[in-house]
Amino acid sequence: MNFVTIDFETANQMPQSACSVGLARFDESGQVLDTFYSLMKPPLGYDRFFGRNIEIHGIRPADVKDAPDFGYLWPEIEYFIGDDFLVAHNARFDMGVLASLIKLFGFDMPDICYLCSLQISRKVWPLAKSHALTALSEHFGLDYNAHNALDDAVNCGKVFIRACNGRLHELPDLRKYLIVRGIELKKLGL
């Protein structure tokens, strides 16, 4: 069973201000099968870059001035996701960005299910000092360029694989494992 991880970086606090996106497809063994990364030009009205955001991800307005916008990238992103479910670390943020951009650009909301690796990590490792992706990546000795959307997506998948503890062969097995922990697949846009 494959799954896709996703991460966005934003220019400011608005979810529509995405300035980069990273996706990674994994198989059940934790092998990265494919990746997708792009800088993204935020739409007009959402394109102001805040200093705090630049400090976090290092992306500046000049970096995205010739980048494609979400309207151009969405068909490629949607194709990459395919029928797989999504995983994001702090999914409320990343799924909020995705749903906001889909609505803003007038696309139909796709039938996408997702899980939050942050929520799962809190249930699986309740005594961890921190459940931030940076802290978990360091704990597991993962190479990591924090706040690069592709690195965030890849490490999200690696943490998710560890949290699922070998239960990724069949979706029903994964669902049972998660339900016992009070976690269910959610639907995008709901």
Name each model feature, range by range.
Residues 1-100, 104, 109-111, 133-147:
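Conserved non-catalytic scaffold segment of RNase H-like nuclease domains
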Residues 159-190:
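Acidic two-metal-ion nuclease catalytic site recognized across multiple nuclease folds
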Residues 114-131:
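Short alpha-helix plus adjacent loop in nuclease-associated cores
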Residues 109-113, 131, 169-172:
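Short, structured loop/turn "capping" segments at alpha-beta junctions
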Residues 101-104, 123, 139, 159-166:
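Active-site catalytic microenvironments for nucleophilic, acid-base chemistry
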Residues 148-162:
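Acidic, divalent-metal-coordinating active-site segment for phosphoryl/phosphodiester hydrolysis
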